[in-house]
Amino acid sequence: MSTFVKVTDLITIMFFLAIAAVITASNTAELDVLEMARTAVVEAKTSFGSMAVTEATSEVAGSYYKLGLSECEKLYDESEARLSKLVVDHENFTVEDVRTWLSGVLANHHTCLDGLIQQRQGHKPLVHSNVTFVLHEALAFYKKSRGHMKKRLHGPARQGHGPTRPKHRPTRPNHGPGRSHHGPSRPNQNGGMLVSWNPTSSRADFVVARDGSATHRTINQALAAVSRMGKSRLNRVIIYIKAGVYNEKIEIDRHMKNIMLVGDGMDRTIVTNNRNVPDGSTTYGSATFGVSGDGFWARDITFENTAGPHKHQAVALRVSSDLSLFYRCSFKGYQDTLFTHSLRQFYRDCHIYGTIDFIFGDAAAVFQNCDIFVRRPMDHQGNMITAQGRDDPHTNSGISIQHSRIRAAPEFEAVKGRFKSYLGRPWKKYSRTVFLKTDIDELIDPRGWREWSGSYALSTLYYGEFMNTGAGAGTGRRVNWPGFHVLRGEEEASPFTVSRFIQGDSWIPITGVPFSAGV
């Protein structure tokens, strides 16, 4: 008996040693993959930085090209910061966190190249191909490895609340009794900080009013004050923007995490500008409001770009913020209104207006209970609601529109029959978009979807529709592309839900914003 026990113990020990060896090898492989990705990004950043320095003193290079190089530096700087965080703390991230951040790094890379092409400038092929290849391999590694890495990286699930919260994620603001307040108190942070905030009874860190009755007259002044707080600032900073039209170009950079903006309501608090591509911006740079700081929340604000349809690409809002959320906001523009650039995003009870590709980008974005208003384009144009930009089969990005409504904007209603309108078209090779239980107006063409150029991406894209309603929801005459799918059951639709697509049940509840975790 004792011999048997010893043999059994030996087998058990050998088994656990083998498991430990696999885990160690896995950790080493992960670190190697992330280090290679960071090295490639740093090399690209250095290369484009050198080019920017050279062009800054050149009398030949145009200012638009210099602008494109400057944006590339910024994008690679953001990517380097994310990859450095992953290298140091990769064991504290879930698999989906890592895949999301790698997907965001790849989106930054492609955005840099797209911007240079837009300015009719080339790029260094070696830099391009090296970064693309390394990030593709890193994404493939995590997609293939997530089975055996799942337990170690995800840890035990919290009962009924999804995965445990990794250290990098936005945390609950820490304003305990030790911090003295003057005036109204902050809302109950455990009861829905964003939803419960009230301008008459809740406290903001900064207040913006055009008439000078608050701490600042402009949003940019308030954000500058946030920057000056440095490391001493609160976990979440609340900025209340009173009713008014704020003609500003705003950029919330990667250092400004956990910013919460609250306005006085759609079409009452308005942030506006008119930058556009024909006048010299890149699509990325044309945004009236751009945000790269993670954990960004906004409520009761309109973001708009007034450049008009004749100015083509003109972004109202660009979002490159992980775990970002927009509640009761409006986004107004024509072409390229809402740039869901990268990372995980949630939109609830929002209004989106536009004509061509007006919800686009390479984020993992979910829209719930939103109203999508198709506007009148120029006479020779058609309308495409979405243009999702997934360019690698291993990224976890896409657009999911759920429990929403597609309608003609008031000025378009009477003439909508004169124009072709579609649910979307494939901006990139692996474009991925689904409409789930959404009410679709008859303005949508029976084909549903439109080609980008010939047969490009028709076999590699993923477009899906599930249980939609309305006169434009019939799938009998939809396109017969290999990549188009009529989803037959909830099991096919569930990968695109809040819970699974953006892991929202682990980070949305603290806001208090209502959401459906499933189909």
From Swiss-Prot:
It is found in: Secreted, Cell wall. Residues 27-141 are annotated as: Pectinesterase inhibitor 36. Residues 186-196 have a biased composition (Polar residues). Glycans are attached at residues 92, 130. Expressed in siliques. Its EC number is 3.1.1.11. Keywords: Aspartyl esterase, Cell wall, Cell wall biogenesis/degradation, Glycoprotein, Hydrolase, Secreted, Signal. This is Probable pectinesterase/pectinesterase inhibitor 36. It comes from Arabidopsis thaliana (Mouse-ear cress).
